[in-house]
UniProtKB/Swiss-Prot annotation:
Catalytic activity: a lipid A disaccharide + ATP = a lipid IVA + ADP + H(+)
Associated pathway: Glycolipid biosynthesis; lipid IV(A) biosynthesis; lipid IV(A) from (3R)-3-hydroxytetradecanoyl-[acyl-carrier-protein] and UDP-N-acetyl-alpha-D-glucosamine: step 6/6
EC number: 2.7.1.130
Gene giving rise to this polypeptide: lpxK
GO BP: lipid A biosynthetic process; lipopolysaccharide core region biosynthetic process
GO CC entries: plasma membrane
Lineage: Bacteria, Pseudomonadati, Pseudomonadota, Gammaproteobacteria, Vibrionales
Family of this protein: Belongs to the LpxK family.
Organism: Photobacterium profundum (strain SS9)
Protein name, per record: Tetraacyldisaccharide 4'-kinase
GO molecular function: ATP binding; tetraacyldisaccharide 4'-kinase activity
Binding residues annotated for ATP, in chain numbering: 68-75
Pfam families (UniProt xref): LpxK
Length: 344
């Protein structure tokens, strides 16, 4: 059913199939979509009018989110931002909802050896890649307050554009440059969390892949040498044969296309749902279809405890043109200077 809904959202299928999907989904989803839109607008208006008061942190808050459901490449942008700010001498911290994790309490501080079972995959990935303080909580303001105890001077939120209970200074929206906004309908009739009008209010639009449109900063994900999930050994993907590829991300075909662009044709491509938990038995069985199992870095953080010696992941880095990157970092630094010292 999920696959059919995605086909309906993003189209580009034979007319007969699209007609069938319209007949199936419009009567059920249209009223729900209208209700979703009404509730979303009403909730945001309450914070804009002051009926509800958002938590304002004593340091700048930067939100990296999107207006569509699913993965658009937000986490690589968060990692990029953290690394750029660290290079400038700032001390960023990251907050996340911790989707897919079940921590014993909230807020919860992510450490180097924290399990994804507790906090989800993205927070663990961000912590291991950057070394920055990361805290998770469904109530993001609680996570922010925890990070303030760890000497941070900028807060970056991984997702949370629609979490208006947390006041923010700068907003990023990451756009899937290939799929864009689908049929431009609100959930569940389409993939939108908010209407496209919302894009006019954000500070930076980042287009992940595809052709960037007006006012969008182009970005692509640059893969590097494979890393062995178990040993940390590095090698070129072209050194491996009979690869089985797997991806448990928002849009698995993006990862499989990356492998093709690297000149690799997997013997099998296995998509999984985003944030899916994996078992050792399941992945061992999958790997037996070839000689090597290749996955995303986001999947790898969930497999370290039981990884086999023929399991590899492809690390990727967000690449943004220098002119856009300079404008982004200078804007954050300017806001930081306006705040002054968090201890002042």
């Amino acid at each position: 059913m999920a696959a059919l809904i995605e086909k309906f959202w993003f189209g580009h299928h034979p007319k007969g199939l699209m007609l069938l999907l319209n007949v199936l989904f419009w009567p059920v989803f249209w009223p729900l979509s209208k209700l979703f839109g009404f509730i979303s607008v009403r909730r945001r208006n309450k914070y804009q009018t002051g009926e509800k008061v958002a938590y304002r942190a004593p340091v700048p808050v930067v939100v990296v989110g999107n207006i569509t459901a699913g993965g658009n490449g937000k986490t690589p942008v968060v990692v990029w931002l953290v690394e750029q700010l660290q290079a400038k001498g700032l001390k960023p911290g990251v907050v996340s909802r911790g989707y897919g994790g079940k921590a014993p309490h909230y807020p919860y501080l992510v450490e180097d050896k924290t399990s994804t079972d507790l906090v989800g995959d993205e927070p663990v990935l961000i912590r291991r890649r950057t070394g920055a303080p990361v805290a998770v909580s469904p109530i993001r303001s609680d996570a922010v307050m925890m990070l303030l105890e760890h000497d941070v001077d900028v807060i970056i939120t991984d997702d949370g554009l629609q979490h208006y209970a947390l006041a923010r200074d700068i907003e990023f929206v990451v756009i899937d440059g290939q799929r864009r906004f689908g049929n431009q309908q609100l959930l569940p009739l389409g993939p939108l969390r908010e209407t496209c009008d919302r894009l006019a209010d954000v500070d930076f639009l980042i287009c992940n892949g595809g052709k960037a449109q007006k006012n969008e900063a182009p970005m692509h994900l640059q893969p590097s040498a494979l890393i062995n999930v178990k040993t940390g050994e590095r090698c070129s993907i072209n050194e491996l044969e009979n690869i089985v590829a797997m991806a448990g991300i928002g849009h698995p075909p993006r990862f499989f296309k990356t492998l093709e662009e690297l000149g690799v044709t997997p013997v099998h491509c296995q998509p999984f749902t985003d944030h899916q938990a994996f078992s050792e038995t399941e992945l061992k069985h999958l790997a037996q279809q070839g000689q090597h199992l290749v996955m995303t870095e986001k999947d790898a953080v969930k497999c370290h405890a039981f990884a086999q010696s023929n399991w590899w992941y492809v690390p990727v880095d967000a690449v943004i043109p220098t002119s856009n990157a300079t404008a982004i970092i200078n804007r954050i630094i300017k806001v930081k200077e306006e705040y002054g010292s968090p201890s002042a």
